[in-house]
């Protein structure tokens, strides 16, 4: 999120090349330059997980189960794709070669185009 903030909230595909595909040296420089901002987001994640754990414990102790859908894909604009491009089917500029979706069925006569990049299983 810190690097996204530096790039005015734009998707990583619209960032300058040095940010889109940073060298290890540039990553180290970013980590040092934006240590305070990175720490802020780490703290927010800590708060969320702490509160989520407390909520789950509270609900479970009262016989309430919190259930949810497990995502099968990640967002194209996620840190996961940005940091691990080799794990996804992307072209040399980072754009997806294909995206996830489903064909027409009884839920949708036209099918659904989800837009998530596909995993590179090889």
Which residues fall in each region the model found?
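Anionic group-transfer/hydrolysis microenvironments
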Residues: 71
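Alpha-amylase-like alpha-glycosidases and glucanotransferases acting on alpha-linked glucans and related
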Residues: 1-49, 74-122
């Amino acid at each position: 999120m810190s690097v996204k903030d530096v790039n005015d909230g734009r998707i990583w595909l619209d960032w300058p090349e040095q940010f889109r595909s940073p060298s290890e040296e540039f990553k180290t420089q970013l980590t040092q330059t934006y240590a305070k901002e990175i720490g802020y987001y780490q703290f927010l994640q800590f708060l969320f997980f702490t509160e989520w754990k407390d909520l789950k414990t509270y609900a479970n102790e009262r016989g309430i189960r919190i259930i949810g859908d497990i995502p099968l894909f990640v967002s194209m604009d996620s840190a996961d794709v940005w940091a691990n491009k080799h794990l996804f089917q992307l072209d040399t500029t980072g754009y997806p070669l294909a995206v996830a979706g489903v064909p027409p069925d009884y839920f949708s006569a036209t099918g659904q185009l989800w837009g998530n990049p596909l995993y590179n299983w090889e």
